[in-house]
UniProtKB/Swiss-Prot annotation:
Record-linked HAMAP family: UPF0225 (MF_00612)
Pfam families in UniProt: SEC-C, YchJ_M-like
Disulfide bond entries: none
InterPro entries from the UniProt entry: NTF2-like_dom_sf, SEC_C_motif, UPF0225, YchJ-like_M
Organism: Enterobacter sp. (strain 638)
Tree of life domain: Bacteria
Protein name from the UniProt record: UPF0225 protein Ent638_2310
Native organism taxonomy: Bacteria, Pseudomonadati, Pseudomonadota, Gammaproteobacteria, Enterobacterales
Entry's family note: Belongs to the UPF0225 family.
């Protein structure tokens, strides 16, 4: 039985993010790194998350917070709605919605993540949370208003 990749690519996990999480390959661009990091949250792989955070973030120092975050969170889906190159080819941005249920309540992370290419490897470095009006179209692509979708 084949398992679809949690990242939402509609590919089998073995043909998608598994190669990055196993360390067989590096994610070739920010979009693939974003998808593989989302998958790491779904399958609770703190080591991969720490390895793909930029070293300046010192993610290993908050390993316990990462692991404890796995306990009550069930990830429901990822929608990438924009990718862009930064001021140089060594910087990229991915805007996304990651839906989850935590303590039986639905939620969403809406972020514009920044990635840096260093030493041939892409790293997550930081992100900003865009603000949406309650009556804006939801960025997840559902066609609903933000207040009736991810903004609940």
């Amino acid at each position: 039985m084949t398992q679809l990749c949690p990242c939402g690519s509609a590919l089998e996990y073995s043909l998608c993010c598994q190669r990055y999480l196993s360390g067989d390959q590096l994610a070739p661009d920010p979009s693939h790194l974003m998808r593989s990091r989302y998958t790491a949250f779904v399958i609770k792989d703190a080591d991969y998350l720490i390895k793909t955070w930029h070293p300046s973030c010192q993610a290993a120092d908050f390993r316990q917070e990462i692991v404890s975050g796995f306990t009550n969170t069930q990830w429901q889906g990822l929608t990438i709605y924009e990718t862009s190159i930064g001021q140089t080819a060594k910087e990229g941005f991915v805007s996304f919605v990651a839906r989850f249920i935590e303590h039986d309540k639905p939620g969403a992370i809406i972020e514009r993540s920044r990635f840096i290419l260093e030493g041939g490897q892409w790293y997550y470095i930081d992100g900003t949370r865009p603000q949406f009006s309650r009556n804006d179209a939801c960025p997840c692509g559902s066609g609903k208003k933000f207040k009736k979708c991810c903004g609940q």
